[in-house]
Regions:
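Intrinsic disorder in cytosolic terminal tails and internal cytosolic loops
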Residues: 124-148
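Transmembrane alpha-helix termini and helix-breaking/packing motifs in multi-pass membrane transporters
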Residues: 90-106
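Hydrophobic core of transmembrane alpha-helices in multi-pass small-molecule transporters
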Residues: 41-55
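Intracellular juxtamembrane helix-capping segments at the cytosolic ends
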Residues: 55-68
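Transmembrane alpha-helical cores of Major Facilitator Superfamily
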Residues: 25, 48, 78-86
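Helix-to-loop junctions at the C-terminal end of transmembrane segments
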Residues: 3-16, 99
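Loop-to-transmembrane helix entry/capping segments in MFS-fold secondary transporters
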Residues: 70-80
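Structural signature of the two symmetry-related core transmembrane helices
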Residues: 18-33, 111-112
Length: 148
């Protein structure tokens, strides 16, 4: 919350795609470093950096607000919350089992998730809006218009 206003201004200035790209690249490095660190001071510094990058995740919400139809906001947000909640239960449970075998591997898997998120962020257009939800050549409306 300490940097929320500045992060919001940064997202407004550089856009959601660039903000999420910065976040995920940073998280890749942080998670790999977590997997390699062996002293508490470095881990504490990484923890602070980790939370600073996670604060940029607000860009996902601003992206959603730009592309979503206002009448679909509540239902879509509900589905998104449910999916996130399921992931927040299943992934830590599975990684808890991995932790018993290798603590470093847990963080390398986290870096892998950040790589996947980075790739997904590249699908966000630089100026998102209704009808411009993705950089892919065929959006939802074009696919429906093209027919089977």
């Amino acid at each position: 919350w300490l940097f929320a206003e500045r992060i919001g201004a940064l997202i407004h200035r550089i856009g959601e795609r660039r903000a999420l790209t910065i976040e995920y690249i940073g998280l890749i490095f942080v998670f790999v470093a977590y997997g390699l660190v062996d002293d508490a001071t470095t881990a504490a510094v990484l923890y602070v950096i980790d939370h600073m990058f996670f604060a940029m995740a607000i860009a996902i919400s601003t992206y959603f607000q730009k592309i979503a139809d206002p009448k679909d906001m509540a239902s879509t947000a509900g589905v998104s919350f449910t999916i996130s909640h399921i992931a927040a239960i299943v992934i830590p449970a599975a990684l808890g089992l991995v932790w018993m075998w290798s603590t470093s591997l847990v963080f390398f898997i986290g870096a892998g998730f950040a790589v996947l998120s980075l790739l997904a962020a590249q699908l966000i257009p630089f100026d998102p809006g209704p009808g411009q939800e993705t950089v892919l050549p065929l959006g939802r409306d074009q696919v429906a218009a093209a027919g089977p």
